[in-house]
UniProtKB/Swiss-Prot annotation:
Annotated source species: Homo sapiens
Gene from which this protein is expressed: ETNK2
Tissue spec: Expressed in kidney, liver, ovary, testis and prostate.
Keywords in alphabetical order: ATP-binding, Kinase, Lipid biosynthesis, Lipid metabolism, Nucleotide-binding, Phospholipid biosynthesis, Phospholipid metabolism, Transferase
SUPFAM superfamilies: Protein kinase-like (PK-like)
Pathway the protein acts in: Phospholipid metabolism; phosphatidylethanolamine biosynthesis; phosphatidylethanolamine from ethanolamine: step 1/3
GO biological process terms held by the UniProt record: in utero embryonic development; multicellular organism growth; phosphatidylethanolamine biosynthetic process; placenta development; post-embryonic development
MF (Gene Ontology): ATP binding; ethanolamine kinase activity
Stated family: Belongs to the choline/ethanolamine kinase family.
Lineage: Eukaryota, Metazoa, Chordata, Craniata, Vertebrata
InterPro entries: Kinase-like_dom_sf
GO CC term, one of those recorded: cytoplasm
Protein name: Ethanolamine kinase 2
Disulfide bond annotation, renumbered to this chain: none
C-alpha cells in the first residue's frame, strides 16, 4: 500500500527531509476532457520490452547515495550537483524518493525501495510484469529499471487524491472510467483465476505459523480467523463476480488526477492481478474512509455507489445499462468489501511484525477486523435482484 507523491517543491541538492505534499491542481477547474466511455481493449496485451536491471542495492535507511548511483545510470547527462531530491513519507509498504533537475519536473525519476520483508506479501516479478502490461495499455508510467531491492519509474504529472476528492462526482466518474478500462485488459485468451483466495490463504498461514503467539488480545483468535476465511470463500465464490485484471489496492493516494488532461491514472501495482471485479470496486469503496485517520462514516452511501457503478458499467459495456445490472453489482461489491477488510487486516498483522516504516499496523489491523465484523450481518443480508 505505497502511496504516491504530489509534486515536490524545489530544494537544495542532495538533502532529504520530511515535506508536506504540495497540491498541483485547482479543484475548481473543470476537466478538459472525460475518459472515453468505450474503454474496451483488444484481446492479448502488446509485447513488453525488456526492463534494464542494475545490480545496485539501496540502503532503505540511507536512500540518497544509492538513488544517485541509479540516476547516474539512467540520466548520465544530469550533473550530480544539479540533481534535486525529495523523499516521500506517506508510503506504508515501501520507501520512495524523487530525483529531478528542472522545477517543472517534466523529467523526474522515482526511486522506490522495497520495504523490509515485503517479499512475504508481494511477488516482485509479477509486479514488474503488471507494470509493463499496464504501460502497454497506456495505464501506467514508464518503468525505467529494476535493481536489487527496488525499481525506478517515471513521475506521473498530477496530484494524489485525498478521501474528500474521491467523493466528488466529477472525479469519481473519472475513477470509474479508468477502472473499467483496466478491467478490460485480457489475459492472452487464457481463463484467469482470481488471486484473492491464494493470497489470503498465504497471509493467514503466515499469521498462524509465525505471528500467532504474539497476537494482541484485540485481534480475533486464529481459530476465528480460519473460520471466517472459509466462510468468505464459500459465500463469495457463489456470487459469480467476473474475474478481470484488477489493481487490488486503489486507495486514494494511488490515484493521480491530472487537471490539465482531465483524467485520472492509477499507480502502485504491487498487488495487481486477475481477481474478482467486485473485490476491486469494494476495496476502493472501503478506501473512502482513508488510511491514517480511518473513518468508516465516509463509506459511500447507497446512492453514491449506484451512481459510481452506473458510470462503471456504462463504460465497460459501451452502452446503456439497466437498474437490475447496477443493483446486482451493488450487492456483489458490498459483499466483497468484507473480503477487502479481511485481506488488509491480515496484511497489517504481517507488516506489524516485520516493517520498519513508522505506521501503527497493529491498530490498523484491529480497525479493519472490527469493521469486518460490524458490517458482516448487513452485507450478508443483501440479496441479488430477481
Amino acid at each position: 500500500m505505497a502511496v504516491p507523491p504530489s509534486a515536490p517543491q524545489p530544494r537544495a541538492s542532495f538533502h532529504l527531509r520530511r515535506h508536506t505534499p504540495c497540491p498541483q491542481c485547482s479543484w475548481g477547474m473543470e476537466e478538459k476532457a472525460a475518459a472515453s466511455a468505450s474503454c474496451r481493449e483488444p484481446p492479448g496485451p502488446p509485447r513488453a520490452a525488456a526492463v534494464a536491471y542494475f545490480g545496485i542495492s539501496v540502503d532503505p535507511d540511507d536512500i540518497l547515495p544509492g538513488a544517485l548511483r541509479l540516476i547516474q545510470e539512467l540520466r548520465p547527462h544530469w550533473k550530480p550537483e544539479q540533481v534535486r531530491t525529495k523523499r516521500f513519507t506517506d508510503g506504508i509498504t515501501n520507501k520512495l524518493v524523487a530525483c529531478y533537475v528542472e522545477e517543472d519536473m517534466q523529467d523526474c525519476v522515482l526511486v522506490r525501495v522495497y520495504g523490509e520483508r515485503t517479499e512475504l506479501l508481494v511477488d516482485r516479478e509479477n509486479e514488474v510484469r503488471n507494470f509493463q502490461l499496464l504501460r502497454a495499455h497506456s495505464c501506467a508510467p514508464k518503468l525505467y529499471c529494476t535493481f536489487q531491492n527496488g525499481l525506478c519509474y517515471e513521475y506521473m504529472q498530477g496530484v494524489a487524491l485525498e478521501p474528500e476528492h474521491i467523493r466528488e462526482p466529477r472525479l469519481f466518474r473519472l475513477i470509474a472510467l479508468e477502472m473499467a478500462k483496466i478491467h478490460t485488459i485480457h489475459a492472452n485468451g487464457s481463463l484467469p483465476k482470481p488471486i484473492l483466495w491464494h493470497k489470503m490463504h498465504n497471509y493467514f498461514t503466515l499469521v498462524k505459523n509465525e505471528i500467532n503467539p504474539s497476537l494482541s488480545a484485540d485481534v480475533p483468535k486464529v481459530e476465528v480467523l480460519e473460520r471466517e476465511l472459509a466462510w468468505l470463500k464459500e459465500h463469495l465464490s457463489q456470487l459469480e463476480s467476473p474475474v478481470v485484471f484488477c489493481h487490488n489496492d486503489l486507495l486514494c493516494k494511488n490515484i493521480i488526477y491530472d487537471s490539465i488532461k482531465g483524467h485520472v491514472r492509477f499507480i502502485d501495482y504491487e498487488y495487481a492481478g486477475y481477481n474478482y471485479q467486485a473485490f476491486d470496486i469494494g476495496n476502493h469503496f472501503n478506501e473512502f474512509a482513508g488510511v491514517n485517520e480511518v473513518d468508516y462514516c465516509l463509506y459511500p452511501a447507497r446512492e453514491t455507489q449506484l451512481q459510481w457503478l452506473h458510470y462503471y458499467l456504462q463504460a465497460q459495456k459501451g452502452m446503456a445499462v439497466t437498474p437490475r445490472e447496477v443493483q446486482r453489482l451493488y450487492v456483489q461489491v458490498n459483499k466483497f468489501a468484507l473480503a477487502s477488510h479481511f485481506f488488509w487486516a491480515l496484511w497489517a498483522l504481517i507488516q506489524n511484525q516485520y516493517s520498519t516504516i513508522d505506521f501503527d499496523f497493529l491498530r490498523y489491523a484491529v480497525i479493519r477486523f472490527n469493521q469486518y465484523f460490524k458490517v458482516k450481518p448487513q452485507a450478508s443480508a443483501l440479496e441479488m435482484p430477481k
